[in-house]
Amino acid sequence: MSKPKRERSLAENEAKAVARMLRVSPQKLNLVAQLIRGRKAAAALADLQFSRKRIAVDVKKCLESAIANAENNHDLDVDDLVVAQAFVGNGLVMKRFAARGRGRSGRVYKPFSQLTIIVRQVEAEAAAA
């Protein structure tokens, strides 16, 4: 007695990977996500490899996971993959105490983010354009 299978929310030529609890603000993560939106998967990996942003390592891991999901779970051709969507969501925000002068206190916010990457297989001639 297992639950009935859900319908697939993505198209047949798409695969998805999600990275949760990334310890960075959504605003900073979105700067890196903008780099790879709409790019070929190989070019996006190269961009992330040489990015100077700290979070680019985690974005690269998530993109590699999406590529692996496309290849292994959905039988898509890795060479024709394009980053169709890369979007960022809010995670939880840890609030911490910071001692200030004269017996006062301040708040330190430690935000977390979520990253979703969807790769799509496109035709070879469309990917070259």
UniProtKB/Swiss-Prot annotation:
Keywords linked to the UniProt accession: Ribonucleoprotein, Ribosomal protein, RNA-binding, rRNA-binding
Coiled coil spans: none
Lineage: Bacteria, Pseudomonadati, Pseudomonadota, Alphaproteobacteria, Hyphomicrobiales
Short name of one Pfam family: Ribosomal_L22
Domain of life, per lineage: Bacteria
Subunit composition and interactions: Part of the 50S ribosomal subunit.
Cited PANTHER family: CHLOROPLAST 50S RIBOSOMAL PROTEIN L22-RELATED (PTHR13501), LARGE RIBOSOMAL SUBUNIT PROTEIN UL22M (PTHR13501:SF8)
Keyword Ribosomal protein: yes
GO biological process assignments: translation
CDD domains: Ribosomal_L22
Gene Ontology cellular component list: cytosolic large ribosomal subunit
Name under which the protein is recorded: Large ribosomal subunit protein uL22
Function recorded in the entry: This protein binds specifically to 23S rRNA; its binding is stimulated by other ribosomal proteins, e.g. L4, L17, and L20. It is important during the early stages of 50S assembly. It makes multiple contacts with different domains of the 23S rRNA in the assembled 50S subunit and ribosome. The globular domain of the protein is located near the polypeptide exit tunnel on the outside of the subunit, while an extended beta-hairpin is found that lines the wall of the exit tunnel in the center of the 70S ribosome.
InterPro entries reported for this sequence: Ribosomal_uL22 (IPR001063), Ribosomal_uL22_bac/chlpt-type (IPR005727), Ribosomal_uL22_bac/org-type (IPR047867), Ribosomal_uL22_sf (IPR036394)
GO molecular function: rRNA binding; structural constituent of ribosome
Record-stated family: Belongs to the universal ribosomal protein uL22 family.
